[in-house]
Swiss-Prot record:
Start and end residues of each OBG-type G domain: 159-334
GO biological process, one term: ribosome biogenesis
Species whose genome carries this gene: Chlamydia trachomatis serovar L2 (strain ATCC VR-902B / DSM 19102 / 434/Bu)
InterPro entries linked: G_OBG, GTP-bd, GTP-bd_Obg/CgtA, GTP1_OBG_dom, GTP1_OBG_dom_sf, OBG_GTPase, P-loop_NTPase, Small_GTP-bd
Positions with a binding annotation for Mg(2+): 172, 192
Protein known as: GTPase Obg
Length: 335
């Protein structure tokens, strides 16, 4: 199951108590303070890892707790520290305080690690309180409680290429062709119900460059107002380096390609206007369903209405135009 939002209560460990104890030697039944300090409670940390793409492993959890520190002991022994708890999250995770909405951290790189809840300090044993004027202190302190925090984790996928289009535009078929995967396809809306990730590289190339591609669930008119799958997955568009709009040029499933493109761009800009500055290419898909003259006519009309856009013709089903698309990826996504 794809889980890209979750709320968790995080509880760091409590510090162990300090103890009152005395040295016991022959002929010296109370030979001075000998009680040790408590161990520190375990902290809770969050760390990004590769090859993780959702919060699925946390979906049935409501809270997580680190270990408590152990109490001190006689012979001035310090209690064992509680073990830290490290939560693994995908790159692209936003960590927020659930109570205030404050952004705590934006995890964008592998290996980032921060402390979210600090473990409580261990209490002091009576050895700590020995002074020149108080040789036999009877005081010890309890351990401090660990921090408790209610947090929200939100994932915005980080991918090189994001496939965007209406349901049944052929995105999943094209995704399968490019990433050589088996994403479910079918002739009904919302075949793709959650983002799919795949690795794209050109077969037969001596020096291959691999890109991460995300197939975003189909967007419908009104998605920016949360219709259809709506805002659930529009967030994943924000971090892709290149947006690949997949338009059904055949016009068989829906209305005209020009109208599709106009509505699609309008929905994305209504969701977040800054998306207009993102690099984008329009993939005119299903050209195998048109005669050559029909292709030329429809492409000419699209270029006339969208003169600033870059178009590429292809068929995800037959593979026509796919090599040109690989070349485009190389030129657009080169370091």
């Amino acid at each position: 199951m794809f889980v890209d939002q979750i709320t968790l209560e995080l509880r760091a460990g409590k510090g162990g108590n300090g103890v009152v104890a005395w040295r016991k030697e022959k002929y010296l039944p109370k030979g001075g303070p000998y009680g040790g300090n408590g161990g520190n409670g375990g902290s809770i940390l969050i760390e990004t890892v590769t090859n993780m793409y959702s919060f699925e492993e946390y979906r049935n959890l409501r809270f997580l707790k680190a270990d408590d520190g152990q109490a001190g002991a006689s012979n001035n022994r310090t209690g064992r520290n509680g073990k830290d708890l490290v939560l693994k999250v995908p790159e692209g995770t936003l960590l927020r305080d659930a109570a205030t909405g404050e952004l705590i951290h934006d995890f964008t790189k592998d290996g980032e690690r921060i402390v979210v809840c600090q473990g409580g300090r261990g209490g002091k044993g009576n050895v700590f309180f020995k002074t020149s004027t108080n040789r036999a202190p009877t005081k010890a302190t309890p351990g401090k409680p660990g921090e408790i925090r209610l947090v929200e984790l939100e994932l915005k996928l980080i991918a090189d290429i994001g496939l965007v289009g209406f349901p049944n535009a052929g995105k999943s078929t094209l995704f399968n062709t490019l990433a050589r995967t088996e994403v479910k396809v079918g002739a009904y809306p919302f075949t793709t119900l959650h983002p799919s990730l795949g690795l794209v590289h050109q077969e037969g190339m001596l020096y291959q460059k691999t890109w991460i591609m995300a197939d975003i669930p189909g967007i419908i008119e009104g998605a920016s107002q949360n219709r259809g799958l709506g805002l659930d997955f529009l967030r994943h568009i924000e971090r892709t380096r290149l947006l690949l709009f997949v338009i059904d040029i055949s016009g068989i499933e829906r209305h005209s390609p020009e109208q599709d493109l106009k509505i699609l761009m309008g929905e994305l800009l209504a969701y977040k206007e800054e998306l207009k500055d993102k690099d984008m290419v329009i993939a005119l898909n299903k050209i195998d369903q048109l005669l050559p003259d029909e292709r030329e006519e429809r492409v000419a009309l699209l270029k006339q209405q969208f003169p600033d856009q870059e178009f590429i013709l292809l068929s995800g089903l037959t593979g026509e135009g796919v090599d040109a698309l690989y070349d485009l990826f190389k030129s657009k996504l080169s370091e």
